[in-house]
Amino acid sequence: MTQEGKRILVMAGGTGGHVFPALAVAKYLAQQGWQVRWLGTADRMEARLVPQYGFDIDFIDIKGVRGNGLVRKLAAPFKVIRSILQAKAVIAEFKPDVVLGMGGFASGPGGVAARLAGIPLVLHEQNAIPGMTNKLLSRIATQVLCAFKNTFTTVKSKVVGNPIRRELIALGAEPKPLADDALKVLVVGGSLGAKIFNDLMPSVVAALSKQQSITVWHQVGKDNLAGVKAAYQQQGQEGGVNIAEFIDDMEAAYRWADVVLCRAGALTVSELAAVGLPSILVPYPHAVDDHQTRNGQVLVEAGAAFLLPQAILDVDKLVGKLQLLANDRTELARMGQRARDVAVLDATEQVAAVCISLAEKG
């Protein structure tokens, strides 16, 4: 059956961990002839990013309520009702065949509005521990999808992995020669950087370079460039370090790297698996329900990563792990292969297939 003219409303926003997997599915369905519309909030990253990919976006007024003050909590029910009505209006005008929720503030009201309208609702949870919105919506969803095993314990769900860019999947399939020169360390702390990496890495490189040849590509985050550059200079290490506020071409960065030091966001973990890179994971300690630790366990249990809680992280521990990897390049390569072995490479197609199936039934 042709997919020409089928319509999907995609709900995802707030962070790249929600938006980029949703974009992968949206692009795939658009190539199959689907009309794609997006539901988000005007003050989050989807407002800027989604139109760049050629998709129309509608906005509703909704913010998170978890952990907010009393007045905001009292007003929350009225704001939620208003946002559901706004989402219902979008659905009534667009008439989607299926609605896909992938996290973010807009998913809650949009998901409720979809079910009230009798439209199939598909949820996808990227993290190993479900967010509050998906946890609530899972009770009314037509189909619940997740990236990791045992994410949902109260509803039936299907494990499909996290949708990621095709370029990264292709990169992981390329043969990677055994590293025998300077250890190439990619340091990524997200778009805002990670203060702990910015604080420790200049001293780590200084200590390690006395024993090993090492080069570093360090994403320091917005407004941190001058300070981190000065710290490397004070350690006499600026020569072997490439410092950037933000790395636009992650495909090039992954291709360059031997090992990655990073947080354990769901999308990061899935990308590391897809490209087949070993990693040192430092979960963000303030993540809701400590979900990053659970995300990272997938790679740790596979023997593809080390996990160091930020509370115990120091220069000596980082030097020790990097020294270990630098001294055993065969094990470094094995860790990369183990990462690739646990990758789910067809997540985009699996999510899209569920949406297509439900649209055809409707």
Swiss-Prot record:
Q: List the NCBIfam families hit by this protein, alphabetically.
A: murG
> What's the catalysed reaction?
di-trans,octa-cis-undecaprenyl diphospho-N-acetyl-alpha-D-muramoyl-L-alanyl-D-glutamyl-meso-2,6-diaminopimeloyl-D-alanyl-D-alanine + UDP-N-acetyl-alpha-D-glucosamine = di-trans,octa-cis-undecaprenyl diphospho-[N-acetyl-alpha-D-glucosaminyl-(1->4)]-N-acetyl-alpha-D-muramoyl-L-alanyl-D-glutamyl-meso-2,6-diaminopimeloyl-D-alanyl-D-alanine + UDP + H(+)
Positions contributing to UDP-N-acetyl-alpha-D-glucosamine binding? 15-17, 127, 165, 191, 247, 266-271, 292
| CDD domains to which the protein is assigned, alphabetical | GT28_MurG
E.C. number: 2.4.1.227
Q: What class of enzyme is it?
A: transferase
Q: Which family does it belong to?
A: Belongs to the glycosyltransferase 28 family. MurG subfamily.
> What is the official name of this protein in its record?
UDP-N-acetylglucosamine--N-acetylmuramyl-(pentapeptide) pyrophosphoryl-undecaprenol N-acetylglucosamine transferase
Tell me what topology the record assigns in the membrane.
Peripheral membrane protein
**GO CC field:** plasma membrane
The uppermost taxa in this organism's lineage are: Bacteria, Pseudomonadati, Pseudomonadota, Gammaproteobacteria, Alteromonadales
Task: Give the protein's biological function.
Answer: Cell wall formation. Catalyzes the transfer of a GlcNAc subunit on undecaprenyl-pyrophosphoryl-MurNAc-pentapeptide (lipid intermediate I) to form undecaprenyl-pyrophosphoryl-MurNAc-(pentapeptide)GlcNAc (lipid intermediate II).
User: Which keywords describe this protein according to UniProt?
Assistant: Cell cycle, Cell division, Cell inner membrane, Cell membrane, Cell shape, Cell wall biogenesis/degradation, Glycosyltransferase, Membrane, Peptidoglycan synthesis, Transferase
Q: Which GO terms describe its biological process?
A: carbohydrate metabolic process; cell division; cell wall organization; lipid glycosylation; peptidoglycan biosynthetic process; regulation of cell shape
A molecular function annotated in GO for this UniProt entry is: UDP-N-acetyl-D-glucosamine:N-acetylmuramoyl-L-alanyl-D-glutamyl-meso-2,6-diaminopimelyl-D-alanyl-D-alanine-diphosphoundecaprenol 4-beta-N-acetylglucosaminlytransferase activity
- InterPro entries given in the database record: GlcNAc_MurG, Glyco_trans_28_C, GlycoTrans_28_N
The pathway entry for this protein reads as: Cell wall biogenesis; peptidoglycan biosynthesis
PANTHER family (UniProt xref): GLYCOSYLTRANSFERASE (PTHR21015:SF22), UDP-N-ACETYLGLUCOSAMINE--N-ACETYLMURAMYL-(PENTAPEPTIDE) PYROPHOSPHORYL-UNDECAPRENOL N-ACETYLGLUCOSAMINE TRANSFERASE 1 (PTHR21015)
* Location of this chain's protein in the cell: Cell inner membrane
Superkingdom of this protein's organism? Bacteria
Query: Gene behind this chain?
Result: murG
- Return any one Pfam family short name: Glyco_transf_28
> Which organism does this record belong to?
Shewanella sp. (strain W3-18-1)
